[in-house]
Amino acid sequence: MQRANRGNNKHYYNKFDYWHYGGYKYSFNKKYIYDEKEKDFYSNENNVNNIENVQKSDEKGFTGNPDTWFNDGECFKSKTFKLRNDIIRTSCYHDVILNNHDIFKDKVVLDIGCGTGILSIFAAKAGAKHIFGIESADITEYTREIIKKNNLSDKITIIKGKIEEVELPVEKVDIIISEWMGNFLLYGSKIDKIIYARDKWLNKDGYILPDHGTISIAGIENTDYKNNNEKFWEDVYGVDMSCLKSAIIGKPFVGICPPELINSSSCRILDIDLYTIKNEDLDFSSKYEITFFRDNDKFSGLVAWFDIGFTKLTNKFNLTTNPYHKLTYWYQTIFYTRNDLKVNKGDKVTGSFAVKNPKTNFKQLNIKISFNVANKGKNEKEAWHQFYKFF
């Protein structure tokens, strides 16, 4: 595989240290996609501080003009706005629902975390008898207006409140739909809400969409990023903050992982079925093994991504956040190692990947990863473990 030359493509804007790779623009803590013609826009510190992700290319998965993202109110810079503009995610749900009319026809649907109500509207178009959308955020005022403007007020009822506190005017529902996934599948997810609603309201032969999820990992080489990151903290406007290096390494990095960085096989570490999963099952420990496929390379850490499936439907679908596929709102998650290790084709890393949720809302995850690196044809081994925390 031909490797791109990253070293000749480095630029510095304002207080962020960027490097460019494969058309992507990175900083130590933010990721931006940009067109070279818009350099002035992205070199403006106010824009850089405000924007969380800009992606201009339909080919990569997002649409929308970033110039309209500021001054439109916090609602439209929120998770809801970004999700609506993730055409990979939205088109997947659209196709799942509208290509399974037989499942939705005359059924009662529960949309958990309905946001703007887009999934509820899809369900109505697919022939659902009635849809109840539950949302705890203040956006429900706008959601009801959207439903009204689309002449669906008789089909869709929006209920404001937490899933554990609201009551439905029906005893059971036939289908639960939700965009329940978070970064790394679990962080910030609504999976506990799905479990609660499933146990309380779902009919015995009902459907959960999506109903299946997996997390996979692979090794990466990304020494440039790590080196630039370390240099940044050594001199922050003349202040030595190098003591923060270990803390930064201990926080999972949510961002774009260009597929060229991947240098090993992949391994699945979690496989869940939404029809049977329990909250206690989401604290897990899984063994893994990956094998490197390039010589004279380095091991900088693990990249994780997730896949979800709609497996019980007549027309089945899946959605992936795999680095080899189009980018989604959820990006990928990278767990950097403290040090880079030299690896060659055939070398292996084995270990365990443990995840614990100390809260009940998945707004914090504690992770422990053990690493055992074995060099093929040599008696050299290195073993250690690291702790990471989503918060």
Residue ranges and their predicted role:
Residues 2-6, 15-112, 116-354, 358-391:
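Class I SAM-binding transferase module
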